[in-house]
């Protein structure tokens, strides 16, 4: 069972929004305070048949109305009795309504209007892991919640399988210790007057549960680092919440399961995680998300063994929903993203799975996703063609006294002119404004749009050299060479080495005589610009870009780059 889509009316700050969910994993992204966590609270309320609070109503005069569409497997048909779509028995649309003065909500079949018992919604099995939970409570073994509940159940299984008499401690010594302890406690007046005494646990389970504590082999778990505690809590939480379903008396556990075509008993669940990046470094963030995906798809044999031992089931069929502000937690591609953004003080939502992008662009986008993840959190994106520009633009912005981070401006290296357009289409589809900077060799007489900028020369490297030369700053051109390679001026540049740059500039390499940069006269405009441009082009990369960015003053920055950065600033400030 998976959530296919949801429509929200009159709920907090996500009123009037709809979204389509990916059947496997979803990442809710966007700026703070736009309703991502509110969406998880909404699912928790609806999927567990809870009542809305007064604060949940956007307009107290109108009801909250949630339309939830579920996709069922053929083996799950009947989970909600005869309630399913008349057009497709594997889907069911639910309407969940409540007025502010009503004590409980109403749930009906969207297509037929038939009433559905609220308790039936618990079969959706929505599990919400909250990273604000305290490890000191959740990882204690001596309680009947969290880890304690799970450990207690495992001990029960062990005790059930012991054929002989279940004696774990020396009864005589325990009795002597109890008498000794109470003899001293009885000297306290209140203990004596009210018969308060130390009492041995009635059952082996109760006694054994208090015998253990979690540790890393050296220290108690509560003395380990926060990251260790939170990763332990995050991974054990799923089992603990399934244990709550298993022990619940409201619905028989067997009624929560379906049997697949191979005869295996499967529990469908929807798992949500709010900000898994809390206390976890990037590798652990990715590891945790991949672990969740593995257990929800039955790809972790150890976890399957635990499910079999604890609950008598063979696996899970799960859907993952993650709220995150971390690019490291985005394990997937753009189709897994659900972006929250604001227009005119209202939250809007775009689902990546609902986008219709051209097939020829999709391969580019899927391959580039790891490099462009930051862009989905941005207010504006600057798209550039190559690594040299990528290395210099942050420094250019700083030189112009423009803070990219404060404004939420992301710089993305498209890796070539041919990829800028597909990336721009993707960003447009997610309502993310972008500014594109192209090399002049692709302009071909085209009139620039307001969000497009072109170098005057064939490429960035030539633009920098000629711009500096035109302003009488040949010493800066040479300084950049010296910063990148202290011997760069004194190496003979052979024809084969300069062949490609010369071809790009339309220079006949056959007329070239090998020489050093130091042999080039500053008074020879053509030779100086051609030789240094060719050297820059051969050395292009992030390091060259950073050196250029750090050396140039505001007046020395080529105008197309300064103008593009200022345009991005304007756009970001008005989003």
Residue ranges and their predicted role:
Residues 38-87:
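Conserved P-loop NTP-binding catalytic core
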Residues 61-68, 89-92, 121-126, 267, ...:
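Short glycine-/polar-rich loops that comprise or flank the Walker A/P-loop
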Residues 58-62, 119-122, 245-247, 261-265, ...:
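Conserved catalytic network of the ASCE P-loop NTPase/AAA+ motor domain
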Residues 54-57, 74-168, 358:
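Glycine-rich phosphate-binding loops of NTPases
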Residues 138-275:
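Extended helical coiled-coil dimerization/tether regions that scaffold
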Residues 1, 49, 71, 85, ...:
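Acidic, Mg2+-coordinating catalytic modules of nucleic-acid enzymes
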Residues 1-48, 218-371, 570-571:
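Switch/communication elements of ASCE P-loop NTPase nucleotide-binding domains
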Residues 27, 126, 270-273, 381, ...:
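Hydrophobic "anchor" residues on beta-strands that sit immediately upstream
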């Amino acid at each position: 069972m998976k959530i296919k889509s949801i429509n929200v009316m009159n709920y907090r700050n996500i009123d009037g929004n709809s979204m389509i969910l990916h059947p496997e994993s979803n990442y809710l992204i966007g700026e703070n305070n736009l309703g991502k966590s509110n969406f998880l609270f909404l699912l928790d309320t609806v999927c567990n048949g809870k009542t809305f609070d007064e604060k949940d109503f956007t307009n107290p005069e109108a009801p909250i109305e949630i339309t939830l569409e579920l996709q069922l497997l053929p083996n799950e048909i009947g989970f909600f009795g005869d309630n399913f779509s008349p057009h497709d028995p594997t889907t069911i649309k639910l309407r969940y309504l409540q007025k502010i003065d009503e004590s409980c909500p109403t749930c009906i079949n969207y297509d037929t209007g038939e009433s559905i018992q609220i308790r039936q919604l618990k079969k959706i099995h929505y599990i919400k892991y909250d990273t604000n939970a305290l490890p000191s409570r959740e990882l204690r073994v001596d309680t009947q919640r969290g880890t304690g509940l799970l450990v207690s159940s495992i001990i029960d299984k062990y005790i059930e399988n012991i054929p002989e008499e279940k004696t774990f401690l020396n009864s005589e010594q325990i009795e002597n210790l109890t008498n000794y302890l109470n003899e001293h406690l009885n000297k306290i007046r209140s203990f004596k007057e009210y018969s308060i005494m130390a009492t041995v646990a009635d059952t082996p389970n109760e006694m054994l549960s208090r015998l253990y504590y979690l540790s890393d082999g050296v220290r108690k778990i509560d003395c380990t680092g926060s990251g260790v505690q939170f990763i332990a809590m995050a991974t054990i939480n799923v089992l603990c919440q399934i244990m709550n379903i298993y022990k619940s008396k409201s619905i028989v556990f067997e009624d929560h399961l379906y049997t697949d075509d191979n005869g295996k008993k499967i529990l469908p669940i929807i798992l949500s995680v709010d900000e898994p990046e809390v206390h976890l470094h990037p590798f652990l963030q990715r590891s945790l998300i991949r672990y969740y995906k593995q257990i929800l798809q039955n790809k972790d044999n150890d976890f399957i063994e635990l499910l079999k031992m604890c609950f008598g089931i063979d696996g899970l069929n799960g859907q993952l929903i993650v709220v995150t502000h971390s690019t490291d937690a985005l394990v997937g591609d753009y189709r897994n993203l659900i972006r929250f953004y604001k227009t005119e003080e209202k939250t809007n939502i775009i689902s990546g799975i609902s986008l219709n992008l051209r097939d020829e662009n999709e391969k580019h986008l899927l391959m580039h996703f790891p490099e462009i993840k930051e862009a989905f959190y941005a207010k504006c994106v600057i798209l550039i063609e190559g690594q040299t520009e990528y290395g210099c633009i942050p420094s250019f912005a700083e030189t112009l006294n423009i803070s990219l981070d404060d404004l939420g401006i992301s710089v993305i290296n498209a890796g070539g002119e041919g990829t800028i357009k597909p990336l721009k289409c993707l960003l447009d589809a997610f309502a993310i404004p972008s500014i594109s900077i192209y090399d002049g060799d692709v302009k071909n007489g085209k009139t620039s749009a307001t969000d497009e900028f072109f170098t005057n020369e064939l490429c960035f490297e030539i633009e920098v050299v000629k711009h500096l030369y035109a302003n009488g700053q040949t010493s800066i051109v040479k300084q950049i060479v010296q910063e990148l390679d202290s011997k760069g001026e004194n190496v003979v540049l052979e024809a084969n080495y300069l062949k490609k740059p010369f071809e790009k500039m339309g220079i006949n390499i056959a007329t070239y005589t090998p020489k050093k940069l130091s042999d080039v006269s500053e008074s020879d405009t053509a030779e100086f610009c051609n030789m240094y441009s060719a050297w820059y082009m051969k050395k292009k990369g992030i390091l060259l870009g950073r050196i250029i960015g750090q050396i140039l003053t505001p007046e020395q920055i080529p105008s197309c780059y300064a103008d593009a950065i200022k345009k991005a600033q304007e756009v970001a400030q008005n989003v």
